[in-house]
């Protein structure tokens, strides 16, 4: 086993963990249009956005914060007029009602066109904005905040004006999971405090949803917490918190969420699942922080194999696998028991399809996190899916590779069919 410089992993986590408001797919469309509009220099008269099928699938039915509306059209309209000082995927932090009114006018007057087309990247957005004889464009590819191209009147410029440029981190694929976990073990409390801060942001979103949001699942689950035994309390609490935060986010409540690998729902699952287990067990702060790091690292590692947007439900598979790993760590389990719990989650949930972003994601998300916590407990009792059974391979790294292959080419046709179903509502 080779030694990993912990700074490599810390840079990866800091890069992949970011603040967002609302679903990241319409948020990224808003960001792309905003970048193009800044380059144009005047308010656009017309907006044309072309997205990959996965972005379309995730953006068509989801709430957009501050608007009371759903979908990519209003997100694109906002990108043309918004004056938010927030950056990246937090662009919709404080949407001005006057901006919403102007965006609605653009949409209602037929000035916003959204199309989807097959692209080489599962995550692709091209925004084109027009005013008089001039036009500008911006392209986002592979990562939700990765603006790879901006141009004015057909001429490309080197970098987007007024937009932060995201730097890429070193891939984690060159390291085994054991090497990654060993690196986490060398990290200090001070180096990992940002993970606790991230978890608290997502907890506040859940609390806001439970208090005043359209969160029927979260509220129903939370009301049933009384009477749960110690062993099941963590799973029940995680289920309620993740459901409420997800419903709040997907309905368009204006609550910030810390995302992992570009997904707010991944961040909700990873952070709140671990937080629920640690608080139920009264785990020390350092133990909690390292469990959060383990959960986040597993999520990022899986997404490197399956890409940011997958045909299977990434929250149910990637994030919940991370929660299972962090749970076993908090319970004092061995590395072998951690891998057993992860294998069980993947072996059970790998085929769960993604059918777009919307409030019902809360059912998948909360159920998967609760199951992951249960599998964490079961692995310590020698109950787990054995290596060589189905998608579960002889090593956890190979199982991650299998997930990537299941996504592409395995589920490509299913993903296209799902888009047809969603578009036909």
Curated annotation (Swiss-Prot):
- Pfam name, any one: SDH_alpha
A biological process (GO) annotation for this entry?
L-cysteine catabolic process to pyruvate
Q: What residue stretch is flagged as signal peptide? A: none
Q: Which InterPro entries match?
A: Ser_deHydtase-like_asu, UPF0597
GO MF: L-cysteine desulfhydrase activity
Q: Which residues cross the membrane?
A: none
Reading the lineage from the top rank, the first entry is Archaea
Q: Which family is this protein grouped under? A: Belongs to the UPF0597 family.
Protein name (Swiss-Prot/TrEMBL):
UPF0597 protein UNCMA_16400
């Amino acid at each position: 086993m080779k030694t990993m410089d912990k700074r490599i992993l810390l840079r990866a986590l800091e890069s992949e963990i970011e603040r967002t408001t609302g679903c990241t797919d319409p948020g990224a469309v808003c960001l792309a249009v905003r970048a193009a509009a800044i380059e144009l220099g005047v308010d656009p008269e017309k907006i044309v956005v072309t997205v990959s099928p996965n972005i379309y699938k995730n953006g068509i039915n989801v709430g957009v914060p501050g608007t009371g509306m759903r979908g990519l059209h209003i997100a694109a309209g906002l990108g043309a007029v918004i004056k938010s000082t927030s950056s990246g995927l937090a662009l919709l932090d404080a949407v001005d009602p006057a901006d919403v009114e102007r965006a609605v006018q653009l949409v209602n007057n037929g000035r916003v066109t959204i199309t989807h087309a097959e692209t080489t990247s599962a995550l692709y957005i091209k925004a084109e904005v027009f005013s008089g004889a001039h036009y500008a464009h911006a392209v986002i590819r592979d990562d939700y905040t990765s603006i790879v191209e901006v141009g004015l009147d057909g001429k490309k410029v080197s970098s987007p004006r007024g937009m932060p440029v995201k730097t890429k981190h070193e891939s984690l694929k060159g390291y085994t999971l054991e090497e990654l976990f060993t690196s986490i073990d060398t990290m200090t409390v001070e180096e990992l405090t940002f993970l606790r801060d991230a978890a608290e942001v997502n907890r506040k979103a859940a609390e806001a949803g439970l208090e005043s949001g359209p969160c029927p699942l979260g509220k129903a689950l939370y009301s049933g917490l009384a009477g749960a035994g110690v062993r099941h309390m963590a799973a029940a609490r995680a289920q309620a918190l993740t459901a409420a935060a997800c419903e709040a986010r997907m309905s368009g409540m204006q609550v910030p969420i810390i995302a992992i690998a570009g997904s707010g729902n991944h961040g909700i699952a990873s952070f709140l699942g671990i937080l629920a287990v640690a608080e139920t067990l009264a785990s020390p702060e350092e133990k909690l922080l390292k469990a959060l790091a383990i959960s986040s690292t597993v999520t990022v590692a899986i997404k490197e194999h399956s890409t940011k947007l997958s045909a299977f439900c990434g929250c149910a598979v990637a994030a919940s696998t991370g929660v299972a790993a962090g749970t076993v760590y908090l319970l004092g389990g061995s590395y072998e028991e951690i891998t057993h719990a992860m294998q069980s989650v993947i072996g059970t949930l790998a085929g769960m399809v993604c059918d777009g972003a919307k409030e019902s994601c809360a059912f998948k998300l909360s159920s998967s996190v609760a199951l992951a916590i249960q599998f964490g407990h079961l692995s310590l009792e020698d109950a787990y899916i054995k290596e060589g059974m189905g998608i579960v391979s002889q090593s956890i790294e190979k199982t991650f590779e299998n997930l990537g292959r299941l996504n592409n080419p395995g589920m490509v046709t299913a993903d296209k069919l799902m888009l047809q179903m969603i578009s036909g509502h």
